[in-house]
Amino acid sequence: MGRLSTFTATEPIIRARLKKARDKHYKSGVLGLRAKPTWDGEAFTYEGTPVTVVACPSVLALWEAIDQRNPEQWTVVLTGVEDDDLGDTVLAHLLDGRLITPDPWDALRGNFSATTIEPALYRTHNDRAIANGLLTALSPDAYTPAPGGVLTRDHAMATIARDVLRIVKDVDVEIDSLAVLEWSRSQDVTEGLITLSASGGPELTAAFQSWLSERSGRLRKPVRALLAAERITDLVPLGVVAGLFDDSDGKSLGVFLGSHGLSDLDVEDLHSWYQNTRGLVTNSLNAQQQQAVLTTAASIVNELAINDAAAASELLPQGLDARLVQLSDAITDGLPNPLPAELDAALLSDVALRDIETHWINLQQHFLADRDHSCRAFGGAVRLARWLASPVAPAQGLKVSTERYVRVDSWVDTALVTARRGADQPIPAAALRAIIDVVLARRGQHDLSFAAALADAPTPPVQTIENVMHDLVIPIAKTSPTLLVVVDGLSMAATNDLVRSTQLEGWTELSANHDARRASALAVLPTLTQRSRCSLLCGELREGGDGPERSGFLSLLHTAQLEATGGVPDPIFHKKALDAVPSGAKLASDVRNAIADVTRQPLVAVVLNYVDDTLHHVDPGGTDWNLETITYLGPLLHAAKNAGRTVVITSDHGHIIEYGTSAKVTRANTYGQRAHGDFANLDPDREVVVKGPRVLTETNSVVLAVDENIRYGARNAGYHGGATPAEAVVPVVVLVAGELPEGASRVVGAEPPWWYAEPVKARDEPTVSSVKRPRKPAQDTLFDDDSEAVAALTNRLADNVVATRVFAEQLALAGRIVLQQAQIKSLLQTLVDNSAHEVTLAQAAAALGVATASVNGALMQAKRVLDVEGYEALRVGSGIVRLDVAVLKEQFGVSE
């Protein structure tokens, strides 16, 4: 008997030998392999030819296999019989006339089309196990020719990474730290590792893990440790946590390292791990993936009870919460307590405001700030703080009071709506409540002043709603086809947000009064729909519903010689007509056709009820007022733009919002929720009597609520009818798309000066905050900044950026763009000069020297130059352009 071979044949080994046979032009035959005479596998095919494997423990078994073979197929015999025992007759039936002793390395050489093998691949303990593991783990179509005919360790292991673990898909994609980070988050990473272990065996698995750790560069230590601990799926969230530590916090560091088997990592390893992870999270993952990673990382922090260390994080929610608390403390400490008698004096000191601004900038630099609703609320609070830090001049008379509301106090109301959306945590919520209370105290005085002026002006010295058609709309329609949009209940505060939304769609706001300012009108009193809207559309003081509005509007058109011709439907559309939208469309056919017909219908009016409806059914304070929010408004403006129409947006009255603080006051003879005729019951501190021809009651007099907390009926989401400017002053917004008409002037700087932070160069050196800040990580990060750095920004930054080699390369890479270097420099300078490093689209357009309608395209060109390698230095969104100065410096290699 011959000696029994200890080699076990596998399908990959057999396939490799069949390949060699095919290379010698064999198409079928008997392949004899010296191996254990055992076979547990199934029959298979090789390149379309069936393969039968037969275990042959004896010469007799060999003869049986030879006799029963199909000459058109492959027969593979596995035997341990020695050649001398076989005889020449048996050997003559075998390929090459002999038994072949398979070598797995030889099989791999053939599969990879290699002539030699790098020693680093096979000079290991039990190298045959690694070779067999490779043959077993790799699929038949995984093999690619070894470069230069040398099968290297890198080539073999990269094939495993690609074929078994799917770390990369393309053979040309290098496996590096980023690839490993991305792979660690894939859904099938655990399954892939199990498959590798089961098919490739422990020797190949260990060899591959060692190789993958080396390919991970600066991440080799954590990758090796987590692969060994079967926790590679935690590589990214743990990498986020790794950024929390330095040598000064040995306790937290020890807890982290000890809990995850990372004891051989030092601070430099953690720093590298964090930097690589941060790059992946901020630049490669979408918002949902980012949230998943950061939520997991935050859970790890909570489990390890290292929240103090996490307070300095620029990525983790704990870091955001800490910055919110710092800003909250700065606001609370800066507010006057108790309130002074003179509320129009500066209520915050310069020092307090600087401290607030410093913490606000720090908060905005946190990665999660843009998507956190608490941060958005504090955006409103910081604006309110700036307003409180500014002394307010007294407003004498209705004209000045109205101007103050349009230019300043309506923006206060806009910021109040934002701040009142609140924060989740107790300390930030208390800070918001504190500043809101101070603002309401000052705003309440302004409301009383406005109401008193309203009562003193039966014939108002301001634009009134019944004259808007005569004075503004009809003159515009005589020079340009016009769409009049009456948004019932639209307040000035909501308009501030709405106009910004229109600018994002390429609209430019024109000054109706040619004074570069937003126009307004005074509603009819009491400020109710059937009085004020009817008066608006009829062009005279009148009370009524849709019918009188229609007839009055058509009469106006006839008198102005703007009536529709050609038998088309009346060019005024209320809710019923607007709602007749055919399936698949966005506008009713009659509405769409009327807007498109600029020849026969020069002036078209539509009435939208959405805002007024929210006062009864929804939450106006939680609504973002934009073209998508207000039903039909977006499609209407789109149709108007296509038709080349000028758009006038106005309202019949504004509104105030219910925040759970109002109380019902019993009065007789009420008009809606905020007006009554019960003159015997008058609270002079909270109500005002108004009289005159514009008061559309039987006696031409009425009592109007001034205090926002008074209502005369059931609780709603909001109210109107009273004498606050939020209810009585309505917007008159004129919009054009494209070139400005001859003689027209755009609205410039509708926002008050405090809406954006004061330019850095105009401010004094900031003082150090008394609020204790969390310890920052030892390493510098892209988000590191402090008050000293902010104050040090000078005119040199823009000059230095455009002078760099990187800037020149970016210009070249950007290809054909219209923007010139001087325009980009001007934009940079404008952004740097603002301590918050942000401006409106209108301000950006001015800096770039382009029309507002073209600014989005210009900004996209600027981003192609300023955003280096995917790092976003210039951010554009929600009508705001923001510069990340830290990223700009980092990517262009400048210091100031």
Predicted features and spans:
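Short acidic, hydrophobic short linear motifs in intrinsically disordered regions
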Residues: 835-847
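…; additionally, a secondary subgroup of soluble metalloenzymes is captured
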Residues: 1-482, 489-647, 651-812, 818-829
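A short, conserved structural fragment
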Residues: 863-877
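Short amphipathic alpha-helical interaction segments
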Residues: 850-862
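Short, amphipathic alpha-helical interaction segments positioned at domain boundaries
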Residues: 886-896
